[in-house]
Amino acid sequence: MASTRFALDVPARCASAGTLAPDVPLCLVFGWVNARDAHVKKYTDVLTRELECCATVRATMPTARAFSPFERSRVAYVTEALTFARRAYGGQTPRKVYLFCFSNGGCWVQATLARARAEGTIARELMFDFEGVIFDSCPAFMSMKSGGDALTAVMRQPLALVVRLTFYALVLVLATVHLCTGTYDQMLTRKFWTTMLNMPNEKKELYIYSLSDTLTDPQKLEALIAHRAKNSANVKVLCFEQSPHCAHLRKHPDEYVKALREFIV
């Protein structure tokens, strides 16, 4: 079952059901910037076919929304995703719901939800209380370089250069505006990191990353994890020495699947 933006996959035991029963766990899976759906589906297949532990809603936030300076664009997208998930359960609430974020493209969903809880920008009846949140290669500290790297990771030249330079120019313009108006702390990248540092604790949080992944900046991520643990978050970590950005499943399948099996219970 799929829509233009969102896809629902279910374990074989639920395939004949018109709507899902509340006792079927749900995992919302959001891919990285410019992710191909087939690549994100490899992860939902692990959950629905290999582990058969939950139904999944799969999506990737459009790049323009992920990098938009306007929060309402992301709020609208997340609202659509939550509405789609609710409809799959006939308006009922699954007893267990998980969130699975890849890189900052997916992590923007968690950041948007965290702010929506505080600001009331998403209807409370749409929101879920997560049983756990999985962060794969995120949250990544955003610098001008890392943002350009993420945007152009799968692009070819000369398009990659054009996109990178355009992105740099937009960041400089926005930074100048914030500096001139005394609102630098409200700049998109700073708000994102502050939100991820100080968001309300989930029941449990799993961070999957590698020390060789420069896009994620493992030192910054480890500092964030330590900060959250110090503030009583139930933190679990799966760290690899060598593994590419958002490709830990491919590089370390056994350890990765084991971590998912133990986390989604």
Question: Across the structure, where does each feature detected by a protein language model lie?
Answer:
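Residue-level signal for short, function-critical loop segments
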Residues: 32-33, 137-139, 211-214
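Gly/Ala-rich beta-loop-alpha elbow adjacent to hydrolase catalytic centers
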Residues: 101-106
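Catalytic nucleophile-loop/oxyanion-hole region of alpha/beta-hydrolase
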Residues: 33, 50, 62-89
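Active-site nucleophile loop of the alpha/beta-hydrolase fold
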Residues: 130-143
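Serine-hydrolase catalytic core
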Residues: 18-21, 164-259
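Short, surface-exposed "cap/lid" segments of acyl-processing enzymes
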Residues: 2-66, 218
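Residue in the alpha/beta-hydrolase core beta-strand immediately N-terminal to the catalytic nucleophile
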Residues: 96-100, 132
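Short glycine-enriched nucleophile-adjacent loop
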Residues: 109-119
